[in-house]
Amino acid sequence: MNFFSNNFGTPCNVEFELDNCQNRKTIEVTQDKGKTEKLFVFIGNEPVSGKVSINIKEKTKKIEHTGIRVEFVGQIELFYDRGNHYEFTSLVRELAPAGELTENKTFSYDFSNVEKQYESYNGTNVRLRYFVRLTIGRSFASNIVKEYDIWVINFVKPPESNSNIKMEVGIEDCLHIEFEYNKSKYHLKDVIIGKIYFLLVRIKIKYMEIALIKRESTGSGPNVFNESETLTKFEIMDGAPVRGESIPVRLFLSVFDLTPTYRSVHNKFSVKYFLNLALVDEDDKKYFKQQEITLWRRGVTKPGLPGSTNNNNNNNTSNTNNTNTPQQKVTESQNEVPEPENNSSDESD
């Protein structure tokens, strides 16, 4: 059992306890100002239940209240719109009617059928979080409020169709290349395999590189904010190619902290991933082509994680990049997050 407490500078301390958390996986979340905390991982529609204890600091004093309630909340915060939080899930349980607390009290709570349709996400301009909130209402003083976060991931089934990506691009009478990737949809521990084939080369190429780019879009309409991050970039060719030359591409996704692709989450934000192929000529002129790929979360059976299956269910979690941008990051501690082992690029376990 795990206890989390907070000293409010108020007449009581509040402690949360989750049921069945002894073997539950955790994820380490880095919040603002470098503060990190470990959150328990919940999958899909797993129930969220436990106990909350209210401990009075001074036994000789009582706490008058207008009612005690506990809520389970799913919330989206847009950092450019601070102060406005968008709740997409909210369930309330009344724990006690108006009265007095004269001694320590422990209440049980159970949110058995709560839908957690989206994954938790900490991004550059947006955060999606799930939390349990206790509120002790008071008439002549501010309410006592304590929130306790959990981390949610969702598994999805493998895509029914997953065709390869093949496209011919270039500059008329100067450069024509054909690039091909083995799939258009990849699970988070997959391997991207492809090749670049030169059909026509009449300019002097110095080198070619490929990059994996994450693009976070927040807002809607004219108020859309796009934030792009280069997760990795490396050179795949050095020197001038000749007609008929083929350059192999191999990119292991398991070494990066990725989320699945998110599309229009509650009409508030999206997260997409792109492969960016760039060629640079001897005049340092850059030619590039960007191709979107879809990422999804694959599920596996692992002991000690309630709710995990081997039915290849999957959908998205942590967000980190290998650049030093000042943002909220999620890092996966070793052996802590339920993800497939990196021993195959196949989509089935």
From Swiss-Prot:
InterPro entries: Arrestin-like_C, Vps26-related. It holds the Pfam family Vps26. It is a peripheral membrane protein. The keyword Transferase does not apply. It comes from the Eukaryota. Residues 308-325 have a biased composition (Low complexity). The keyword Transmembrane does not apply. It is found in: Membrane. GO terms for biological process: intracellular protein transport; protein retention in Golgi apparatus; retrograde transport, endosome to Golgi. Keywords: Membrane, Protein transport, Transport. Residues 299-349 are annotated as: Disordered. GO terms for cellular component: cytosol; endosome; pathogen-containing vacuole; retromer complex. Its main location: membrane. Residues 326-343 have a biased composition (Polar residues). Belongs to the VPS26 family. Component of a retromer subcomplex consisting of vps29, vps26 and vps35. Plays a role in vesicular protein sorting. Component of the membrane-associated retromer complex which is essential in endosome-to-Golgi retrograde transport. The vps29-vps26-vps35 subcomplex may be involved in cargo selection. PANTHER family: VACUOLAR PROTEIN SORTING 26 RELATED. This is Vacuolar protein sorting-associated protein 26. The gene is vps26.
